[in-house]
Amino acid sequence: ELFVVEWLRRHAPSRYAVRGQDKVEFRMGHVVSINIDITVEDLETGQTAFVLDTKYKAAEQPAASDIEQVVAYAEAKGCTQAALVYPVELGRPVSGMWGADIYVRSLAFGLGGNLEEAGRNLLEQLQLWGETGA
């Protein structure tokens, strides 16, 4: 997670601020906090452009609970773009709408080969996805 955060911080366009462990608090009789692995803020709009949840284990496909988690993160930040980031390409990746307004997809930041290339591929997917709306 920290590696992905640092890589994105160093290579993302200057229009974006990348944050790791972005804490969001809710008051529900008492304070409930969640920590979002990675948020990417669009500095031109002041809005959260993406929420990313990093995963450490390879899987055939994302677990339903992981999708629900990243959707909750997106809702908490008022964000319409959410991604699960895995260390390898998934056999059955996801890409689609959750409800009417949150686009969820699984992406890879491959850790087994050229890390610069893997990072550029992730950044390209985020740029294309964010700049063109999917």
Regions found by a protein language model. Name each.
Residues 1-134:
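Catalytic core segments in nucleotide and nucleic-acid processing enzymes
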